[in-house]
Amino acid sequence: MGCVLVNDRRILSTGYNGFPKSISDDLSRYNDRDFKISITVHAEKNAILNAAKNGTKVEGSTLYVTFPPCSQCASAVIQAGVATVVCPNPIFAPERWVESFLAASNLFCEAGVKVLYYSDADLCLTETAPSVEPTG
């Protein structure tokens, strides 16, 4: 999972899913799913934190991400003042994330953050919010 924050065609910051700085990321920790999930810093938050650490303002920027933001990352994106999010359409995501993606979509809508969804198949941008329903 990766993320790039851009403004005026200039890269402001990048981030990726990973353990916090100085925390060992040996294979046994990645294989313990509960532990991994509990400490992983998502790409969006890493990009925002990296920008803050470097004194880079991200307000009004566009966030490009390789996976739809979860509700926690959506909150951070909104709080940082990001104006636009470009991400894959969540209808193609694993079912376990659907609830969080729906919450994120609602948060973005309420906060006025523009979201452009794309599909890997055609990489066409659209402003139509996805219709995501759990399957199975």
Sequence positions of predicted segments:
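Zinc-dependent deaminase catalytic domain
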Residues: 1-136
